[in-house]
Amino acid sequence: MNTLVLKIDTILSKHLKKQLAPYTISSQNTYVAFAAKKNGVTVLLYKSGKLVLQGNGANALAQELNLPVAKTVFEASNNSQDIPIIGSDEVGNGSYFGGIAVVASFVDPKDHSFLKKLGVDDSKKLSDKTIQQIAPLLEKQIPHQSLLLSPKKYNELVGKSKPYNAISIKVALHNQAIFLLLQKGIQPKQIVIDAFTSQSNYEKHLKKEKNHFPNPLTFQEKAESHYLAVAVSSIIARNLFLDNLDQLGQDLGYQLPSGAGSASDKVASQLLAAYGMSSLEYSAKLHFANTHKAQALLTK
């Protein structure tokens, strides 16, 4: 996926709107004056006059529309590392026990040497011990914004007849983490989110969020393997999740496993026997199938 950002004048803006009129789409971003999608490329025209094209065919569409590609502010492929980037990632959404940690981090090219010396990589490839050693160093050096949604709060917000589902809650957390980081004066050239849903679905859920920002987003699967900024966020988020999981376990007197396998079913059934459902409301995501499996284990 390529991202093209251009500055166009009023005359070209009117011409563009006429050309793309049959491909118009809605956008809830208050900073966007016009939005369209053609040939898989999303086109966003901001009130400031900035034009953003996102998609693998961005260059081809720009040529088709006779846009001044030579005046591109930047053209970034998915593995571009030579511009200041905000990367956002989450950890914990697939684990029955523990909350959800979302982190947005700002990495400037001048940080690359420091990060490579630390061996920063996708946190999923690193041991928990290594993550716990690296994360404090990253937190000290790299501008970031961390958010932790506790299981108790998660259960209040996510589920049937509740404000959020498992996808929309992550949209809210990513959006808020990035928004708060931008409020600190950070000025990225690109913002990358580790894709957990489609861009259109993300934007649909974003409509009900209070805070918005004008910066375009890049959605990349396995982004932590392509962008150092996302890898940093992945590591900090993993450490935050592990700390939360450990603290919850200490509070209850049980070692809580990560993940959503049979080990989680077993511990959950033990917690139900010892403390009742309130212990799972405090430590786990109740809408997971593990809750029913744990209840079934009690009857055996």
UniProtKB/Swiss-Prot annotation:
Give the disulfide map: none
The RNase H type-2 domain sits at: 83-300
User: Keywords of this protein's UniProt record, alphabetized?
Assistant: Cytoplasm, Endonuclease, Hydrolase, Magnesium, Metal-binding, Nuclease
Report the co-factor binding details: Manganese or magnesium. Binds 1 divalent metal ion per monomer in the absence of substrate. May bind a second metal ion after substrate binding.
What SUPFAM superfamilies does the annotation carry? Ribonuclease H-like
Chain segments annotated as coiled-coil in the UniProt record: none
Source organism, top-level taxon: Bacteria
Q: Where in the cell is it found?
A: Cytoplasm
**Metal-binding as UniProt keyword:** yes
Q: Where, in this chain's numbering, is a divalent metal cation bound?
A: D89, E90, D194
Task: Offer a single GO CC term for the protein.
Answer: cytoplasm
Checking Pfam families in the record gives: DUF3378, RNase_HII
Q: What does this protein do?
A: Endonuclease that specifically degrades the RNA of RNA-DNA hybrids.
What name appears for this protein in its UniProt entry?
Ribonuclease HIII
Q: Which organism is it from?
A: Streptococcus pyogenes serotype M5 (strain Manfredo)
Its gene name is rnhC
